[in-house]
């Protein structure tokens, strides 16, 4: 399935806040080393958990989305279920990301 980039505020609203199913959002930056390091693991998760929509938001391109979500460190992962944020993970922590995925599937 893969991790799909979100390119606009309207697209973020449509695909994340208006979503009815589980969603994972990776807030990242192109210059962020840990973001690049965790990207393959996130791709793998997206292929394993096909019932979850995986998106990524470049904080430099969509700074207003990052700010409105309280993102202050990269990478930050938000886990949504039914349009509500359930979990947040700051940093490239594979175990915590797995736990966030599990939480939105329950």
UniProtKB/Swiss-Prot annotation:
Disulfide bonds join 32-35. InterPro entries: Thioredoxin, Thioredoxin-like_sf, Thioredoxin_CS, Thioredoxin_domain. The active site is at 32 (nucleophile), 35 (nucleophile). Residues 2-106 form the Thioredoxin domain. The record marks 26 as: Deprotonates C-terminal active site Cys. One of its GO terms (molecular function) is protein-disulfide reductase activity. The record marks 33-34 as: Contributes to redox potential value. Keywords: Disulfide bond, Electron transport, Redox-active center, Transport. Belongs to the thioredoxin family. Component of the thioredoxin-thioredoxin reductase system. Participates in various redox reactions through the reversible oxidation of its active center dithiol to a disulfide and catalyzes dithiol-disulfide exchange reactions. This is Thioredoxin. The gene is TRXA.
């Amino acid at each position: 399935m893969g991790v799909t980039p979100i390119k606009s505020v309207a697209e973020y609203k449509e695909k994340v806040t208006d979503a009815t199913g589980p969603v994972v959002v990776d807030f990242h930056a192109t210059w962020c080393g840990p973001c690049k390091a965790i990207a393959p693991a996130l791709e793998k998760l997206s292929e394993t958990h096909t019932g979850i929509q995986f998106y990524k938001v470049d904080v430099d391109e969509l700074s207003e989305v990052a700010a409105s979500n309280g993102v202050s460190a990269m990478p930050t992962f938000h886990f949504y279920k039914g349009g509500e944020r359930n979990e947040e993970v700051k940093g490239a922590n594979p175990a915590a990301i797995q736990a966030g995925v599990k939480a939105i599937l329950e």
